[in-house]
């Protein structure tokens, strides 16, 4: 046996899988790798599909971690939530890098298969919508997009009516004794969050006495990390779209780059950003 074969077939490596589960079976690779179905004959459509499918897989993990973190905070278990939220930030940094790959798609290449998408658009990503809901940016009107699939619509409806990460963070402030206005605590959580002076005052106190409120301080910084990464993702999204299609209308009917620029102004945790100025 050649030396390189000895390395590859090291004694103890399993080779008989007649009655054992394989790597491919565990990951269901046959199903996963057969889901890249091009609707055109253009070579670069495969890139477009893989980038978006990979992003959806990462978003699935983000939701998994965000939902677990929300439950952990609700149960007053903040330190475990920190690990989950830190992982979310790492995933976000990974997704941002995917724009570098998609940016290798030129306008001349994309135009060859863009019509194959019809009205399909990333705007319709239900997982991205659920991430926004989990972070507190609630948009009830967006549910109409998902009426075609009753089961999916029900999931999004549930997410819309579920307390967000920022909702439970504010509850953590209340449990620590901070006087949060009743209008904040009794607000309609299906609507976008609006900043409040009592919430801002609480966070200012947290940042002014880090040692006393260490866990709340750590929570606040984890939230800032997530929004920071999300805004970087949004910016790269906008610039990549501009690079590929310029200022054309999006396939989903939006104004394209103009819409994506407006989205950059959406803020999830306004008081945590205000604190930077007020300290």
From Swiss-Prot:
Binds 1 heme group per subunit. Substrate binds at residues 48-52, 110, 114, 251. Pathway: Amino-acid degradation; L-tryptophan degradation via kynurenine pathway; L-kynurenine from L-tryptophan: step 1/2. It is an enzyme of class 1 (oxidoreductase). One of its GO terms (molecular function) is tryptophan 2,3-dioxygenase activity. InterPro entries: Trp/Indoleamine_2_3_dOase-like, Trp_2-3-dOase_bac, Trp_2_3_dOase. Its cofactor is heme. GO terms for biological process: L-tryptophan catabolic process to acetyl-CoA; L-tryptophan catabolic process to kynurenine. It catalyses: L-tryptophan + O2 = N-formyl-L-kynurenine. Heme binds at residue 237. Its EC number is 1.13.11.11. Heme-dependent dioxygenase that catalyzes the oxidative cleavage of the L-tryptophan (L-Trp) pyrrole ring and converts L-tryptophan to N-formyl-L-kynurenine. Catalyzes the oxidative cleavage of the indole moiety. Homotetramer. Belongs to the tryptophan 2,3-dioxygenase family. PANTHER family: TRYPTOPHAN 2,3-DIOXYGENASE. NCBIfam families: trp_2_3_diox. This is Tryptophan 2,3-dioxygenase. The lineage of its organism: Bacteria, Bacillati, Bacillota, Bacilli, Bacillales.
